[in-house]
Amino acid sequence: ARTDWLIFVDGDCVLHPRFVEMHIKYAQSGTILAGKRVRLSAALSERVMQTGKVPCLLPYLVCPRGCSHVEEGFFLYGAQWLRRGAKHLIGSNMSLSRTDLMAINGFDENYLLPATGEDYDIEWRMQRNGCKIVSVKNLAVQYHLYHKENWTNHDENMVYCKQLQAANQIVCKNGIQKL
């Protein structure tokens, strides 16, 4: 990366037109910006892929039709009183300072299984290193396209994570640098 602020997204997500703008606007060293995402149904995902546009989600609040977390899909700039805080990170909608990430040696490459561990690991190491989670819910809006999930048994990842926490290992050994 060539910038001082890093934004993380997944390839199976569609971003609101102001997604990047909001991550940049609220960027501040010592913070991790945490957003959420709407999980679109198979039918709505197909429609989005065909048209290139996300339709108005208001009807899906009343009748979700296979969608979930629809309330996360509304851009609410200037309505802080409507937004809830973020307690945890989702790796597909987060951003942070390159300097803060380098201080903990980046992502731990020992997490080999998908789905569980990586997001939580980066969250607790960054927080232990003094960073705070700041919510960009309903600002950095993201839509997750439907696909079959490929969840595996993640017990191995969680055991590894708990070992690192018990040892208070904030700087990972198998990250950007191999220590």
Language model segments and positions:
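A short, conserved alpha-helix in the catalytic core of glycosyltransferases
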Residues: H88, N93-N105, L112-C131
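The conserved acidic donor/metal-binding loop of glycosyltransferases
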Residues: D10-V14
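Catalytic core of nucleotide-sugar-dependent glycosyltransferases
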Residues: T116, L139-A140, N153-K178
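Active-site donor/metal-binding and catalytic loop motifs
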Residues: L40, V136-N153
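Short aromatic/hydrophobic "clamp" motif used to bind/position activated sugar donors
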Residues: L6
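Conserved donor NDP-sugar-binding/catalytic core segment of glycosyltransferases
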Residues: R18-L58
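Short aromatic-enriched loop/helix-cap "lid" or pocket-rim segments at secondary-structure transitions
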Residues: L44-V48, H147-K148, H154-N157
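Short, flexible, basic/aromatic active-site loop/helix in glycosyltransferases
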Residues: K53-A86
